């Protein structure tokens, strides 16, 4: 069996590692020209399936936590906290034996997953061909590849999905009624320490009355442990966000920052500080429009979808990456079975196996898409059940800025 993977993001690379461990032939193609071509995102929570994920990969991989933990080099456990507006109690999760998890910095995570993977860069999919005998993918640079299975791991605006379904992105992607302002900043000294006291990692400020859900998070810590990059996303439900005349599409960075500070004006100074310290140039100029994807079915054949190409969702429940990793591990098992049973050229066996994968993947993915969409409404977020585990009260404690050896 020879597997073609379009997309060297978290999902495509995880699948490649799973295939590498099983000795299954593969090629992986990425549209970016190199690994630093574009921003990879901030941080992602790895939880509940971390042990399974590590076990699914070859033994020559570096330690996942050491390679990706966004708290490194600080010797404190990461936390995910929530602060309801009507309460002074902090609830959430802390990395511990009862609720183990990693907040992985996404650039480090992608590099980790790329260990010993020969990524072919600058390969933007132009078109695909598939029939009962095999698959072929052709790229904008004039090259192409042929194989037995093509996996579309090429993200939200998947060309593989578009070609497989013969539907445009606008036909299948739903605009999320979510207006958001995003800011970034660097903190050091006492300001850094005060943020760590609010959470060793990330925290959400829930304002049920105003309908705002604001997520603040550490991105990564400097090598000396004395400063860190932070980011925040202030969002609320807004069905008019796609209107080109929406005020956010025309607002200056200063106007967006002023709005965020006004929304936070009734909160305690410790919660206002991260917004007060955000420089104007740290506010994102563009207004991001989130989209999600619910597919009721997919064709079963030699072209398979996974990750955001199959079930993109909002980031607020932390389930996008979780589902992508499950997709990769599940698909690897299906392909391994076909390979071992020598069914690579048996189209009926391939259809049955891909049907099995699609059914489970879509049911799980659609459920997460729907639950993630509900979190958009800040007035309802208090009633939502998280994936990781029941939230617990997290008491406050002093934060020693001790750096690991």
UniProtKB/Swiss-Prot annotation:
GO MF annotations in UniProt: FAD binding; monooxygenase activity
Family the entry assigns: Belongs to the paxM FAD-dependent monooxygenase family.
Cofactor(s) annotated in UniProt: FAD
Name of the protein: FAD-dependent monooxygenase thnD
EC id: 1.-.-.-
Family matches, as PANTHER family: FAD-BINDING DOMAIN-CONTAINING PROTEIN, MONOOXYGENASE, FAD-BINDING
The protein's role, per its UniProt record: FAD-dependent monooxygenase; part of the gene cluster that produces the tetronate natural products trihazones. Transcription analysis of thnD confirmed this gene is expressed, hence its role in the biosynthetic pathway remains cryptic. The pathway begins with the formation of trihazone A by the hybrid PKS-NRPS synthetase thnA and the trans-enoyl reductase thnE. Trihazone A is further decarboxylated by the 2-oxoglutarate-dependent dioxygenase thnC to produce trihazone D. The function of the FAD-dependent monooxygenase thnD has still to be identified.
């Amino acid at each position: 069996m020879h597997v073609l993977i379009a997309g060297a993001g978290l999902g495509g690379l995880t699948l490649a590692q799973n295939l590498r461990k099983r000795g299954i032939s593969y090629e992986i193609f990425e549209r970016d020209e190199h690994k630093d071509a574009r921003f990879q995102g901030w941080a992602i929570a790895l939880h509940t399936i971390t042990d399974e994920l590590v076990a699914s990969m070859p033994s020559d991989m570096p330690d996942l936590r050491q390679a990706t933990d966004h708290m490194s080099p600080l010797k404190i456990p990461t936390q995910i906290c929530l602060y309801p507006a009507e309460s002074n109690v902090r609830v959430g999760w802390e990395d511990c034996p009862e609720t183990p998890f990693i907040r992985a910095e996404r650039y480090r995570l992608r590099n980790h997953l790329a260990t010993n993977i020969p990524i072919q860069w600058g390969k933007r999919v132009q078109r695909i061909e598939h029939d009962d005998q095999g698959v072929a993918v052709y790229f904008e640079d004039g090259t192409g590849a042929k194989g037995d299975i093509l996996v579309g791991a090429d993200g939200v605006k998947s060309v593989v999905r578009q070609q497989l379904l013969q539907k445009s992105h606008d036909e299948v992607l739903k605009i999320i009624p979510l207006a958001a302002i995003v800011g970034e900043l660097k903190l050091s000294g006492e300001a850094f320490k005060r943020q760590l006291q609010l959470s060793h990692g990330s925290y959400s400020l829930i304002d049920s009355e105003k309908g705002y859900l604001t997520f603040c998070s550490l991105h990564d810590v400097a090598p000396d442990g004395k400063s860190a990059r932070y980011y925040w996303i202030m969002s609320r439900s807004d069905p008019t966000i796609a209107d080109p005349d929406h005020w956010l599409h025309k607002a200056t960075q200063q106007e967006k920052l002023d709005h965020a500070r006004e929304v936070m004006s009734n909160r305690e100074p410790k919660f206002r500080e991260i917004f007060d310290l955000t420089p104007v140039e740290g506010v994102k100029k563009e207004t991001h429009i989130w989209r999600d994807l619910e597919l009721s079915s997919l064709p079963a054949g030699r072209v398979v979808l996974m990750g955001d190409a199959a079930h993109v969702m909002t980031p607020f429940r932390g389930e996008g990456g979780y589902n992508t990793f499950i997709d990769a591990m599940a698909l690897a098992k299906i392909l391994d079975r076909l390979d071992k049973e020598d069914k690579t050229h048996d189209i009926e066996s391939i259809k049955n196996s891909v049907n099995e994968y699609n059914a489970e993947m879509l049911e799980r993915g659609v459920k997460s898409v729907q639950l993630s969409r509900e979190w958009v409404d800040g007035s309802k977020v208090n009633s939502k059940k998280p994936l990781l585990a029941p939230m617990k009260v997290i008491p406050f404690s002093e934060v020693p800025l001790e750096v690991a050896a």
